[in-house]
Amino acid sequence: MTQDSALLQAPEAIPSESLRDGSNSRKVFIKTYGCQMNVYDSMRMSDALARDGYEPTEDMEVADLVLLNTCHIREKAAEKVYSALGRLREMKKKKAADGREMMIGVAGCVAQAEGEEILRRAPAVDVVIGPQTYHRLPEALRRAKQGQRVVDTEYAIEDKFEHLPIAESRRIRARGVTAFLTVQEGCDKFCTFCVVPYTRGSEVSRSVSQIVEEAEKLADSGVREITLLGQNVNAWHGAGSQGEAWSLGDLLYRLAEIPGLARLRYTTSHPRDMDDRLINAHRDLSALMPYLHLPVQSGSDRILKAMNRRHTAAEYLALIERIRTVRPDIALSGDFITGFPGETDEDFKDTLRLVEEVRYAQAFSFKYSTRPGTPGAELKDQVPEEIKAERLERLQMLLLKQQQEFAESCVGKEIDLLLEKPGRMPEQLIGRSPWLQSVNVDAKASQIGDIIKVRITGTGTNSLFAEHAEAAV
């Protein structure tokens, strides 16, 4: 899952007027790094901490607990966390001198990868907790209050979601009309460049009943759009009411029946797990938005094999054709890596050719960075940094051109726009198009959550502009 996805958003603090006892509650500041799943995890940790009297704050200075929810995907991720912990150590010392206590916790994938090393290198840290054990965070903090320094990164036998509360309606409403919902975690693909199997573990799917219960609570609390999350979300599997095997497509058909829930999305997918049921869901479900993030990483079969992607460029292109046949208006997004070990100029040209053929609405691209413990780090023929950078620049120029062309192709179209949040100008709201673009339109704050018909009138640097086409629906 890309850490720079357009879906990325920070958890929002609940306004003080919505707190039951805002004057006496303890405050938690959560800094979220990385992917959408970390955003979701931060929200679930915040909800769990609420039962122990913690309420979120956006002001680190008033926080009784500072929690870093970390990501281990990019190069030097751990060192960036240690740098942040050094700054927090000084803040903790300053608060202690003023007679105020501040606890520091590290969660997420760096916590999983580093474990005890964090306590050794950052003595100010009180709690280290992994992504599979954060349901035990309140207990870890209670132990830390008693003077223990806690590391809890062992993969839990129990299902953490069975022990996590679903947020109260007031907290859901404060977060807006769109929401993330994790349905699957971990990955069994073992791509040679990726740390996810080592930090998130093997593939685990949440039960249908858990997912439906949470989705219904979100919809009842005013959420209009849900994005299903997973490191390999289309590997999700479960059982229907009669015990029959369900895939992600079956789950989407079920969620589309929930009253009030107008839109569905999912991310991130692996090409090998795009089955017929899921493809047909794009054909049949009006609630399933015509947008698909389907990473390919390279257009070279030789590099795809070295990456252990388990598909060829031709198979990926054939899959794209099948999807576009059933949903011609679908917009595609992807992930790319330049400079994987052994990548030649011809391999890179294969990637450019694939991009030209697919034509992406948006995409995310990165230079290859070695991740300790992955097979890719041991490969010979590491590509020089300057060549990685030059290839990345060329690729990004092509992807940006395609993104701009897609945005311009939307001008003049009438679309359904979900109004999400205030814009920069008075009497302006920002909405989300079916293709995940931000759209600016004149509207009142009372219309947030409405889906209105608009006509796209122009493009900006990272957004579109629109005018009303007809009344709200």
UniProtKB/Swiss-Prot annotation:
GO terms for molecular function: 4 iron, 4 sulfur cluster binding; metal ion binding; N6-isopentenyladenosine methylthiotransferase activity. [4Fe-4S] cluster 1 binds at C35, C71, C109. Catalyzes the methylthiolation of N6-(dimethylallyl)adenosine (i(6)A), leading to the formation of 2-methylthio-N6-(dimethylallyl)adenosine (ms(2)i(6)A) at position 37 in tRNAs that read codons beginning with uridine. It is found in: Cytoplasm. It comes from the Bacteria. Monomer. It is an enzyme of class 2 (transferase). The keyword Chaperone does not apply. Belongs to the methylthiotransferase family. MiaB subfamily. Its EC number is 2.8.4.3. InterPro entries: Elp3/MiaA/NifB-like_rSAM (IPR006638), Methylthiotransferase (IPR005839), Methylthiotransferase_CS (IPR020612), Methylthiotransferase_N (IPR013848), Methylthiotransferase_N_sf (IPR038135), MiaB_methiolase (IPR006463), rSAM (IPR007197), rSAM_horseshoe (IPR023404). Residues 408-470 form the TRAM domain. PROSITE patterns: MTTASE_N, MTTASE_RADICAL, RADICAL_SAM, TRAM. Residues 1-21 are annotated as: Disordered. Gene3D superfamilies: Methylthiotransferase, N-terminal domain, tm_1862 like domain. This is tRNA-2-methylthio-N(6)-dimethylallyladenosine synthase. Its cofactor is [4Fe-4S] cluster. Residues 173-405 form the Radical SAM core domain. Keywords: 4Fe-4S, Cytoplasm, Iron, Iron-sulfur, Metal-binding, S-adenosyl-L-methionine, Transferase, tRNA processing.
